[in-house]
């Protein structure tokens, strides 16, 4: 959603503060514009945030030693391969700032921060257009776009905003092509844990071959968007040093580190979130189709759909924030993205859409 608030253009979803300013802080809000866990922050994480307060008079550990060790154990990689940051967006910008590629490749559509970070360092960005006729799936033509002179390739698995995955054989060929061309593959796996089989879509096992930076975040799976905590996985010592140097010295606060440690213990919560998304995603997709929308068959915790009727303002007046995809390259104003929420929340969205579209729901 691109909105101007106090002369500031907002690129992403989740603008609850703008809604509160417009409609009043106590207005009933359903935010489906941000793809975070519908179960909210785990109780154990909230408790950890409160418990760490007495230690906040000291600087946080700049190396996030305990958290990096815990992440390494959870991911099955050495702790030395882990770099924590102020959300995955922090690490996207660090990658651009650290390497300053002259030319980079992204897909269209894709998460806007890739191109924003690359633009900030004067990089020429090439967009590989994903075809609507193929539901915006990545195809083998992408391999031909990875050629010498391209210094960085951003790929999202699953893609945002489509929610679609790439077949593993093609992912591996993309990585090999990047290595041959001398390009760093930055693979964004922030939504990977919402997939039916996350292990089938991660490239963690390929890290030791070099040329690969994997990005993940606590934001989505644990409902921790306000905490700001993400991490990168990389086997390259020299690259990690550059990424660390490109960031501020205390990028991850004491509360964020405490929250991350607590979140990694919330295995039951993760299972509950995954089960909820698995049950609700097809139900929400069917509801959107019944309203006449074209729905991309996403595999994560959000759905991309097309509707020719303007939806953003009518839904805002009904207390619902929906993500317009009009600012995504390769899409347009008729495309929208919605998070998959709880059953009652999804029902509220579908009922409101039915009112707007005159379907009598």
For each feature predicted by the language model, list its residue ranges.
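N-terminal "arm"/small-domain region of PLP-dependent enzymes with the aminotransferase-like
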Residues: 1-58, 183
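PLP-dependent enzyme catalytic core of the Aspartate aminotransferase-like
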Residues: 169, 317-318, 327-361
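PLP-dependent aminotransferase class I/II
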Residues: 41-42, 63, 211-296
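Conserved PLP-binding catalytic core of the aspartate aminotransferase-like
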Residues: 277-278, 288-319
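Active-site pre-lysine segment of PLP-dependent enzymes
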Residues: 119, 136-149, 161-221
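Short beta-strands and strand-loop turn motifs
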Residues: 31, 127-129, 152-159, 185-189, ...
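Short loop-beta-helix segment that forms the pyridoxal 5′-phosphate
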Residues: 60, 72-94
């Amino acid at each position: 959603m691109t909105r101007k608030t106090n002369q500031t253009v907002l690129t992403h979803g989740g603008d609850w503060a703008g809604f509160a300013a417009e409609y009043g802080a106590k207005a009933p809000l359903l935010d489906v514009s941000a793809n975070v866990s519908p179960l909210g922050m785990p109780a154990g994480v909230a408790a950890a945030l409160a418990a760490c307060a007495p230690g906040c008079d000291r600087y946080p550990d700049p190396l996030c030693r305990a958290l990096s060790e815990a992440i390494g154990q959870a991911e099955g990689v050495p702790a030395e391969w882990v770099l924590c940051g102020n959300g995955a967006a922090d690490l996207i910008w660090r990658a651009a700032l650290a390497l300053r590629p002259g030319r980079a490749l992204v897909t269209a559509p894709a998460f806007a921060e890739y191109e924003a970070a690359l633009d900030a360092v004067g990089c020429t960005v090439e967009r590989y257009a994903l075809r609507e006729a193929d539901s915006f799936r990545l195809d083998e033509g992408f391999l031909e776009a990875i050629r010498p002179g391209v210094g960085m390739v951003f790929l999202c698995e699953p893609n945002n905003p489509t929610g679609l995955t790439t077949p593993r054989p093609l992912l591996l060929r993309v990585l090999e092509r990047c290595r041959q061309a001398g390009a760093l593959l930055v693979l964004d796996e922030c939504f990977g844990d919402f997939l039916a089989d996350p292990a089938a879509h991660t490239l963690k096992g390929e890290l030791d071959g070099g040329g690969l930076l994997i990005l993940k975040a606590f934001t989505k799976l644990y409902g921790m968007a306000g905490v700001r905590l993400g991490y990168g996985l990389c086997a390259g010592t020299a690259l990690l040093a550059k990424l660390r140097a490109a960031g501020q010295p205390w990028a991850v606060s004491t509360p964020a580190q405490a929250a991350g440690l607590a979140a990694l213990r919330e295995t039951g919560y993760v299972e509950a979130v995954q089960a909820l998304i698995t049950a609700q995603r097809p139900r929400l997709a069917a509801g959107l189709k019944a309203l006449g929308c074209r729905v991309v068959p996403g595999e994560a915790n959000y759905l991309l759909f097309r509707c020719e009727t303007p939806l953003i303002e009518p839904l805002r007046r009904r207390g619902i924030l929906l993500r317009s995809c009009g600012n995504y390259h390769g899409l347009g104003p008729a495309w929208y993205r919605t998070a998959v929420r709880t059953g009652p929340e999804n029902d509220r969205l579908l009922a409101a859409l039915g009112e707007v579209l005159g379907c009598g729901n």
